């Protein structure tokens, strides 16, 4: 019987290391939590890709918030071999932008997520994705990844939320909206940002949405939420 190999044993080994290959081979599937989170991340900015025609896949992450990417790497700990790396660039306004990048190693375990989001090497939304695969935890990671306030004016009482879905087609965003409204009893609609579709969750749906996602929003990302009048017993609970 092959001895179980711990992640600490394979740090700094080359890609062709026998021990590294044994470590990868002992992993089989993502956990149910990793699948839930993965769906939420891929609805946002994370990307899944294959370099061997779909035999294996890996997920790539890049965000400005260091605490958030550290949290994600911890959630996918056994699949991430290197810590987040700092990336610097100059934007179109001439300002320095710092982000943090990380990725999992390629593995068959990520193929399940690839089947949900990738068609002909491009990101897509399958029919009934929300109804069949999205949970409140998925919603929370989708929001942390690519959501925000509709109204950023200081002191605003507007609790409307936006999910930035500009990378998807109008039909795909409509499918997401229908799923959200049906499964989670929200009242979402489509709006446009620079002629690209986004999902608008109105003020009157916010309390429902908040109670769904609040248990899973990490402390460092709660600034993205509008103020909330009420309490949640799970406010600081992180799964």
Curated annotation (Swiss-Prot):
Compartments, as annotated in UniProt: Mitochondrion
Keywords: Endonuclease, Hydrolase, Intron homing, Mitochondrion, Nuclease
EC number: 3.1.-.-
Source taxon at top rank: Eukaryota
Biological process, per Gene Ontology: Group II intron splicing; intron homing; mRNA cis splicing, via spliceosome
GO cellular component, one term: mitochondrion
Record GO terms (molecular function): endonuclease activity
Transmembrane regions: none
Keyword presence, Disulfide bond: no
Family matches, as InterPro entries: Chloro/Mito_RNA_Process, Homing_endonucl, LAGLIDADG_dom
Enzyme class name: hydrolase
Protein's job: Endonuclease involved in mitochondrial 21S rRNA gene intron homing.
Family: Belongs to the LAGLIDADG endonuclease family.
PANTHER family on file: PENTATRICOPEPTIDE REPEAT-CONTAINING PROTEIN OTP51, CHLOROPLASTIC (PTHR47539:SF1)
Protein name: Probable intron-encoded endonuclease I-ZbiI
Gene source species: Zygosaccharomyces bisporus
């Amino acid at each position: 019987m092959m001895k179980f190999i711990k992640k600490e044993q394979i740090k700094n080994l080359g890609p062709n290391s026998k021990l590294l290959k044994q470590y990868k081979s002992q992993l089989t599937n993502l956990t149910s939590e990793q699948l839930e989170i993965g769906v939420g991340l891929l609805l946002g900015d994370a990307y899944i890709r294959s370099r061997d025609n779909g035999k294996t896949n890996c997920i790539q992450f890049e965000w400005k918030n260091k605490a958030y990417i550290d949290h994600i790497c911890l959630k996918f700990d056994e699949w991430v071999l290197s810590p987040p790396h700092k990336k610097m660039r100059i934007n179109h306004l001439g300002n320095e932008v710092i982000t943090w990048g990380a990725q999992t190693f390629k593995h068959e375990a990520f193929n399940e997520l690839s089947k949900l989001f990738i068609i002909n090497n491009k990101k897509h939304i399958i029919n009934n994705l929300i109804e069949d695969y999205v949970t409140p935890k998925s919603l929370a990671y989708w929001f942390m990844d690519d959501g925000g306030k509709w109204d950023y004016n200081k002191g605003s009482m507007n609790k409307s939320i936006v999910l930035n879905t500009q990378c998807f087609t109008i039909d795909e965003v409509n499918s997401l909206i229908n799923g959200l409204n049906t499964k989670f009893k929200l009242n979402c609609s489509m709006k446009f940002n620079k002629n690209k579709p986004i999902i608008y969750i109105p003020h009157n749906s916010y309390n429902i949405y908040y109670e769904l996602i609040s248990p899973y929003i990490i402390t460092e990302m709660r600034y993205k939420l509008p103020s909330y009048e009420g309490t949640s017993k799970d406010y600081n609970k992180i799964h």
